């Protein structure tokens, strides 16, 4: 079977940001959601956060040790269930579970199949959640996906996220992010209305026309990897990946 998904929030052009903006603040962020908030503020000129981050889990049958760059969770009584639990008050929010040990794929394997995820006491159905949540027994993580799991969108309710811990684990980031959907839709609407779709394609070349002054930086939504070369008005320009 084949599934085709449409991204209603795709911004198919470049965005202008101030030349004086320090993009290091994104790379030096302490968490995934902090990085997203810093990127959002740079692109939108909004001082408010796009995400609220929650990491104060209630522990049941668990002992946590704060290490230098990570946290170690140990099940106290191996014969009894162990849980991490928190409740988020939602009002038109999209929720994500952030579970990350490292950006190195080989290290993330160590936390695979550590949890079963429950939303309001209902086991998250792997076939109805997303394509990264693949194990038939409902455990997570199971496939490297930047450590994020889509928990769904909620209008006006309290949502309780409970993680059943299946074994001891070490982790760098464990949190739930709540995205303000209204704020995000407003951001996308503003950006898509401001910039015209002047992108053309020719084999392995992507062209975009835009007008800016010397005080702006062109931010492209095109995914970047090694091998890309950028020319502006025929002159080679360096690319900074953020």
Label for each model-derived stretch:
Residues 21-64:
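Catalytic-adjacent loop/helix segments of enzymes that bind and process anionic phosphate/sulfate esters
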Residues 1-33, 122:
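Aromatic/acidic, Gly/Pro-rich catalytic loop(s) in extracytoplasmic/lumenal soluble domains
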Residues 19-29, 34-35, 177-185, 201:
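General structural signal for secondary-structure boundaries
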Residues 5, 11, 47-242:
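Active-site-proximal, structured, solvent-exposed surfaces of multi-pass membrane proteins
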């Amino acid at each position: 079977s084949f599934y085709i998904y449409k991204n209603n929030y795709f911004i198919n052009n470049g965005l202008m940001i101030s030349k004086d903006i320090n993009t290091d603040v994104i790379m030096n962020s302490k968490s995934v959601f902090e990085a997203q908030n810093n990127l959002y503020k740079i692109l939108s000129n909004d001082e408010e956060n796009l995400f609220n981050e929650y990491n104060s889990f209630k522990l049941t049958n668990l002992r946590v040790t704060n290490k230098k760059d990570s946290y170690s969770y140990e099940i106290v009584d191996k014969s009894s269930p162990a849980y991490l639990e928190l409740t988020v008050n939602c009002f038109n929010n999209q929720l994500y579970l952030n579970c990350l040990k490292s950006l190195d794929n080989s290290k993330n394997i160590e936390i695979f199949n550590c949890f079963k995820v429950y939303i309001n006491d209902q086991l998250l159905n792997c076939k109805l959640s997303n394509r990264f949540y693949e194990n038939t027994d409902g455990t997570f993580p199971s496939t490297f996906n930047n450590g994020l799991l889509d928990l769904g969108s909620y209008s006006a309710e309290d949502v309780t996220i409970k993680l059943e811990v299946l074994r001891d684990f070490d982790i760098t980031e464990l949190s739930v992010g709540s995205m303000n959907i209204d704020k995000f839709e407003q951001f996308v609407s503003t950006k898509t209305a401001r910039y015209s779709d002047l992108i053309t394609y020719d084999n392995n070349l992507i062209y975009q026309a835009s007008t800016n002054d010397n005080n702006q930086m062109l931010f492209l939504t095109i995914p970047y990897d090694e091998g890309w070369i950028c020319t502006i008005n025929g002159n080679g320009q360096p690319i900074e990946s953020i």
